[in-house]
Structures are given as structure tokens and as C-alpha cells.
Design a protein with these regions (language model features):
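Membrane-lumen/periplasm interface segments of specific transmembrane helices
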Residues: 34-49, 53, 58, 200-209, ...
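Short hydrophobic/aromatic helix or loop-helix immediately within or flanking a transmembrane segment
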Residues: 61-75, 83-105, 263-270
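Loop-to-helix entry region of an early transmembrane alpha helix in multi-pass inner-membrane enzymes
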Residues: 84-85, 90, 94, 98, ...
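Transmembrane-helix motifs of polytopic, lipid-linked glycan transferases
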Residues: 101-102, 112-132, 295-298
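Transmembrane-helix signature of polytopic, membrane-embedded enzymes
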Residues: 126-147, 311
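Membrane-interface alpha helices of multi-pass inner-membrane proteins
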Residues: 146, 167-172, 180-207, 227-233, ...
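Short acidic/glycine- and proline-prone juxtamembrane loop motifs at membrane-interface regions
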Residues: 156-162, 330-331
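Signature aromatic-anchored transmembrane alpha helix within multi-pass, membrane-resident enzymes
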Residues: 225-229, 350-380
Length: 382
């Protein structure tokens, strides 16, 4: 009898898998259309301005540092006497430069790694949306995420695409109870960016809940809680050992002008902007994104978003709002916080298809224009 039921259910499982694969393909196609269009706009703008599109996409701002690490390893320091600042490449985590080096090095290799990671991230974001809200909302979640103001970064030789991919699949594994997969990907996320600690926080907090609240003391749960933060901690300790200072990594960050001041710097910039001081377009966009992120965070809590996604997103918000320096880059720091878009995707999934398409197309167009502005006109890093 059991064998008969299993045989009967096999075709159903096959159909479900095919349906999931088709929907994931639609999500990936939507992502490719939105971000491919954005890259085309940047490339055309670069040609018009007499710039090399590959260098604009693969060698701008932080990309220079990642490519330098990939080519020559760590040890580069740049001093700016005018501002009395020292910039060390130890501020940048090692996984992305390592992958660029393994791919051959240079801007093209950087873009190959980033675009591959961005595609993996899009499918991971879709799977989370599908799991929680259904296939249509999952596709819309990906399209919304690809249409964010700073989503141009997903097509640059930056670490955000890699972090988003590792975070999305780690969180998906965690939601499915695959502890070791979730922890392993979280450890890799911790080797990608400082904010990779958010993925580790999600895995560790959920593991603690299993251990302390639900009484689940399975070895995989213990291992996940210990493994998840290992990547982030190992790099921070390695920099500390190199500089003969346990807090050496945070010293490097302060020398870059980045530190955690519990939101003092953010509030100061917001106050100056709102009190009538000169406000640039990047500052205006940042203010709008931070306000929207705060509102969406409240919506996520009210919608009873699963604990792993809440912890992950809350950690990103604390780091972004609480950090001083690089105010105009805060929307980029929130780019991995895709769970904030779940309530919006759910609402759009209930709307008419024509409305959802129109909203997404409008947001994508704005993202294309702003992305080109950031890379070709703005004087601050994206």
C-alpha cells in the first residue's frame, strides 16, 4: 500500500518541481531584463561620455580595491594628507577577491563573478518569496528587488551580489531546516562583507531558539550555531593578528571614516538635510530609502515575518542606521535586505497583473536613470 502511494505521488512531485523550475526561470528572466536594461543604460551613457563601459562597471570605486587584492594580495595602503586619512585594503573581506582571482583577474572576471552571483541571488530570493507567499509573489519580489534605487550595484564588480546570493540561500536553507547548509553559507557570507554577520546572526539566533525554547539538541543545531559566525570572526581576528591589535579591523574601518556610533552620524546628517542645508540628489534618495526601510520593517513585524528573516533584516538595519560615514552609500548597504520587500510583493501579487507590471516598469526605469547618474555623474560612491 505504501509503495503504491509513493508511486502515485512521484508524478505529482515531478510536476511540482517542473512548475517551480519554470517559475524560477521566469523570476530569473525578470531579473535579467531589469538589470540587463540598467547595465545597457550605463554602457550607452559611458560610451556617450567617452568612457569604457567595462571600466565603469568593473573598475569603479570599491572595485579598484577588490581587483587590486585579487591581483596582488593584501597590503595596499593609500594616504590622503589633505584629510589626514589612511585607507587600507584590509577593510575589504577576502572571498570576492579570491573568486575574481580564480576566474582570471581583472574587471571582466570581476563582472563574471558578480553577474553569476546576482543570478544565483535572484533565484534564492524567488525561492524565499515562493515559499512564504507563492510563485507570483516570488517573481514580483525579485522584480522589486532588482528595481531598487541602488540595484545598479548588482551589476558591478562589488561584493553585494555575492553576499545577497549567500544570504538568500542560507536563509532559504534555514527556513527549510537544513542547518548545516544554512551555517556553511552563513560562514561564507561572513567572509564576503562586514554585513555578512547578519546572516550568521540569523542562523545563530534560530539555533538558540531550537536549543533553549524547543529543546532540540540535535548535533546539527549545535554545529550550525557555532559554524555560522566562523567566517566573519576568522577574518576580523586575522586582521587583528596582522596589526597586533585585537580590534585592528575596527581601527582600519575608523581610518576609512566608518564606525558604529549608534546612529549619531546618521541623525546629524538627517538633521542638516531637514533643517534647510544644501541637499544633493544622493542624500535625498538616501533619506527616502531610510524612511521607507523603517516603514517596511514595521510592516514586516506586523506581518509576522519568520524569525530568521526578521533577525537578518534587523541586523542589517542596525548596522546601516547605527553606522557613521558614507551616508550616501546606506541604500547600498540595505540592498541585501530583500525581506523588507515581502509585504510589498504580497500586496502587488493581489493587484491586477497590469498594475503590477506598470509599477515594476516604473520603478525599473527610475532605477536605470539613477544607476547611470551614480556611476557617470555623482561624485560620491554608490
Amino acid at each position: 500500500m505504501d509503495a503504491t502511494r509513493q508511486a502515485a505521488s512521484a508524478p505529482g512531485r515531478t510536476r511540482r518541481r517542473r512548475g517551480t523550475a519554470r517559475s524560477a526561470g521566469v523570476a530569473l528572466g525578470a531579473f535579467a531584463a531589469v538589470r540587463g536594461g540598467g547595465a545597457l543604460v550605463v554602457a550607452l551613457g559611458a560610451w556617450w561620455a567617452g568612457k569604457d563601459p567595462v571600466k565603469v562597471l568593473g573598475g569603479s570605486w570599491d572595485s579598484f580595491w577588490y581587483l587590486s587584492i585579487a591581483a596582488r594580495g593584501y597590503g595596499r595602503t593609500q594616504m590622503w594628507p589633505a584629510s589626514d586619512s589612511i585607507q587600507s585594503d584590509y577593510a575589504f573581506f577576502p572571498l570576492y577577491p579570491l573568486l575574481v582571482d580564480l576566474t582570471g583577474g581583472g574587471p571582466v572576471a570581476g563582472l563574471v563573478v558578480s553577474w553569476t552571483a546576482a543570478a544565483a541571488a535572484a533565484v534564492g530570493v524567488y525561492r524565499i518569496g515562493e515559499l512564504l507567499l507563492g510563485a507570483r509573489a516570488g517573481v514580483l519580489l525579485v522584480a522589486l528587488w532588482a528595481s531598487l534605487p541602488h540595484a545598479v550595484v548588482l551589476g558591478l564588480a562589488y561584493t553585494e551580489p555575492l553576499l545577497c546570493a549567500l544570504a538568500a540561500w542560507s536563509l532559504y536553507a534555514l527556513l527549510r531546516g537544513r542547518w548545516l547548509w544554512a551555517a556553511s553559507l552563513a560562514a561564507l557570507a561572513g567572509l564576503t562583507r562586514p554585513t555578512g554577520i547578519a546572516v550568521a546572526a540569523a542562523v545563530t539566533v534560530v539555533a538558540l531558539r531550537e536549543l533553549l525554547v524547543r529543546g532540540n539538541r540535535a548535533p546539527a543545531v549545535w554545529a550550525a550555531g557555532l559554524l555560522a559566525p566562523a567566517g566573519w570572526a576568522s577574518y576580523v581576528m586575522a586582521v587583528g593578528a596582522h596589526r597586533h591589535d585585537p580590534l585592528g579591523y575596527f581601527t582600519v574601518q575608523r581610518q576609512w571614516g566608518s564606525r558604529f556610533d549608534f546612529g549619531g552620524g546618521t541623525l546629524e546628517t538627517v538633521w542638516k538635510a531637514l533643517s534647510g542645508g544644501p541637499v544633493t540628489l544622493p542624500v535625498t534618495v538616501t533619506l527616502a530609502v531610510l524612511a521607507a526601510a523603517g516603514l517596511l520593517a514595521v510592516a514586516a513585524v506586523l506581518d509576522r515575518t519568520p524569525l530568521p528573516l526578521l533577525v537578518y533584516t534587523a541586523t542589517l538595519l542596525v548596522i546601516t542606521f547605527g553606522g557613521a560615514g558614507f551616508f550616501e552609500s546606506k541604500p547600498r548597504f540595505l540592498l541585501p535586505a530583500f525581506p523588507l520587500l515581502l509585504p510589498v510583493a504580497a500586496a502587488m501579487a493581489r493587484a491586477r497583473p497590469r498594475t503590477a507590471v506598470a509599477v515594476t516598469a516604473g520603478l525599473a526605469g527610475l532605477s536605470w536613470g539613477y544607476g547611470a547618474y551614480l556611476l557617470l555623474i555623482a561624485t560620491v560612491p554608490p
